[in-house]
Amino acid sequence: PLIRSIFIPEKDCKWGIFDYSQQEPRLVVHYASLKNYMGASKFVDSYQEDDTTDFHQMVSDLADIPRKQAKTINLGLFYGMGKGKLMSQLGVDQETAEDLLAGYHERVPFVKKLMMDTMRKAGDKGFLSTIEGRRCRFDQWEPANEWGKKALPLADAQREYGEHMIKRAWTYKALNRLIQGSAADQTKKAMLELSKQGYLAHIQVHDELDFSVANDKD
């Protein structure tokens, strides 16, 4: 709110706020459907039939859990949250969290499939390509069998932890990097196209673009 308050519309204009509708869930569905993962086609069909489809509500209905819990789990998995943090966000104990996740993955299997696939690719190739072809690199390494050690460049990690005792770091964030990177591609591309038409955004906030809009009282 403080940063937004710095910006005001141009003279004789009003403030216009435009954002994507569930940009990141749609990207998850897009990538899962490209792989023909089980369950993704249901969401594709729903988006094609009704562009106001609420991803979180669909997951809520499928997994038979409240929408708030569905949204928390969705975003937690998209952003690479660990089980401990997800438990805290849900406000439940470990057993309940594990039951919720098990039910979620059984009824919405494509999210976990996509998460595991992106982790594997990041580990094998060292990068993922976003929807516009930018590379999200995973070029740091950590011990393969120890948690909490500092991630280092390859040569440093080999010296510190042993040449054959390391793995790529941060791969659990692979889905997050793919989805947020692709969302950034879409938003920046939209900003570029709009600027070519003479519409310059005053500020970008995540998936939102804010403009001065002619105050047409008619």
Predicted region positions:
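Conserved catalytic core of nucleotide polymerization and phosphodiester-bond processing enzymes
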Residues: 1-218
